[in-house]
C-alpha cells in the first residue's frame, strides 16, 4: 500500500539560499512523523510546499501514491491536506465560529445562519474537548486560544494529512494535553501527521518516526525513537555537542535598577511589587492567564497603569507610552515577534538599526548608510544570524533568526538599562536557544536589568538568578536560584483553588 504522504527528492532555492536539497521520506496513515532541526533548517519551507504557498524547484509530493501539484492553498486543502503554520491565519474581527467555518458558512437565500453555525461549532468543540466561546471574536482571544482555533479548523475539514508546525508553542499545560489527545485520536483514526517541534518531550511522547534537517538537507531518519538517545537527536540537529544549553555563570550585581511597588493594571488583580538589580536576570513564571505579559506591558507603557509606582535607579519613573520607556532605556522584546517585534517589510539591517537611528547613525540630516551597514554586518556575524545578506527582508528569516535580529537591535543601543524579554525562545531550536542565552548574559554583564518571561520551566530555572512566580494576576511568591526547583515553582504557580483541592 502506498504511503499516505511521500516527499520525493524535494528541492527549493531562494536567491542566495538553497532552502531544501533532496528531501525524501514517507508518512504512513496512522503515523505521527516528527520533523526536527534548527531554525532555518528548512522544516517550515517544506510545509509551505505541502500547503501550496511555495512550489518545489525539483522533486514531487505524492498523496496516497498520486503525484500532486499544489498551486495554491485551496488546491492543498482540496486534496485533503491541512497545514497549520506558526504564523496563525485568522480574521481577527470574526468570531470563533465564523473563522472555523470561513468559506462554508451555512446560509439560506444568501443570508448566513449564524445560529446554526454557532450551534454546530459548539457541538464540534465540545466533542474535541476544547473550551472556546464560539461567539467570541478572535481579536479578544489569547495567542494560545487562537492557536487552538487553527488546530480545530484543520480537524473540522476532516483532512487525511495534517501538518503541525510548533503547535504547542503558545499553549498552556492543559491545552497541550488536549492537543496530545487530539493527535492520539487522529492517529487511531488513520490520519497521517507531520509534527514539527523543538521540544524533545513532545517528540518522544507523540512521534512514531522522526526525520532530522540541517541546513536544508535531510541528515538522519529514524523509523522508531525507542532506542535513540536525546543526545543523538541534538547532535544530528546542530552538528555539534551541546553539553550545557544554559551555560549559566554568576555575575556581580549592582544596585536596584528597576523597582515596582503595588503596580496595577486592567488585567492585574493585586498590586505587583518586585525589584531587579543591575546585571540581574529575574525570571517570571506562571501558567497561561497568570498576568505576566500584562504586567510587562504595563511597565513598558503598552498598557494602562491604574495604580502603583515605578522607579529607575532610585528616581520616580512616569511612563505613559512605549516611547517614554525607550527614552528612559527600557525596552521590550514581545511574545508575538511577528506582529509586534519586527518590521516585516523592512530588511534585516533596517530592523537591527531601528533604535540606533535616534542617535549616532546620522551624517547631518541624513542617515549614515555606511555605518548602518557596518553595524548590521557586525551583529549578523556576532549573533550568527542566518541570512543571505543584510538586505534580505526579515520576514523571510526563521523565527530564531528574527529573534536574534531583535536582540541585536538592543545590543546596538548604547543607553540600555532594562530589557524585558517575553517568551524570548518560543518556537526556537536548541542551537539558537544556546546562542540567545549568550546574548542575554552579555546584556546582563553590561549592567542591564533583565526581566525574562517564559513558560518553559527548565529555561526559567536554568537562566535566572531569581524567579518571581505569578498566579491569577498577582505575584504568588519569589524564589532564589538556590532554592528553586520545579515542584516549588509549580506549587506557587497553581491557582489557590487548585492547590487547596490537591491538598
From Swiss-Prot:
Cell compartment(s), UniProt: Cell inner membrane
Function: Part of the ABC transporter complex AraFGH involved in arabinose import. Responsible for energy coupling to the transport system.
Family statement: Belongs to the ABC transporter superfamily. Arabinose importer (TC 3.A.1.2.2) family.
Principal location: membrane
Reaction it catalyzes: L-arabinose(out) + ATP + H2O = L-arabinose(in) + ADP + phosphate + H(+)
Enzyme Commission number, as recorded: 7.5.2.12
Record text on subunit structure and interactions: The complex is composed of two ATP-binding proteins (AraG), two transmembrane proteins (AraH) and a solute-binding protein (AraF).
Cellular component annotations (GO), alphabetically ordered: plasma membrane
Primary gene name: araG
Protein name: Arabinose import ATP-binding protein AraG
Keyword ATP-binding: yes
Top class in the EC scheme: translocase
Disulphide bridges, residue numbers: none
InterPro entries for this protein: AAA+_ATPase (IPR003593), ABC_carbohydrate_import_ATPase (IPR050107), ABC_transporter-like_ATP-bd (IPR003439), ABC_transporter-like_CS (IPR017871), P-loop_NTPase (IPR027417)
Entry coiled-coil feature ranges: none
Domain ABC transporter as annotated: residue spans: 5-240, 253-497
Topology relative to the membrane: Peripheral membrane protein
Gene Ontology MF term list: ABC-type L-arabinose transporter activity; ATP binding; ATP hydrolysis activity
SMART domains: AAA
Binding site for ATP: 37-44
Assigned keywords, A-Z: ATP-binding, Cell inner membrane, Cell membrane, Membrane, Nucleotide-binding, Repeat, Sugar transport, Translocase, Transport
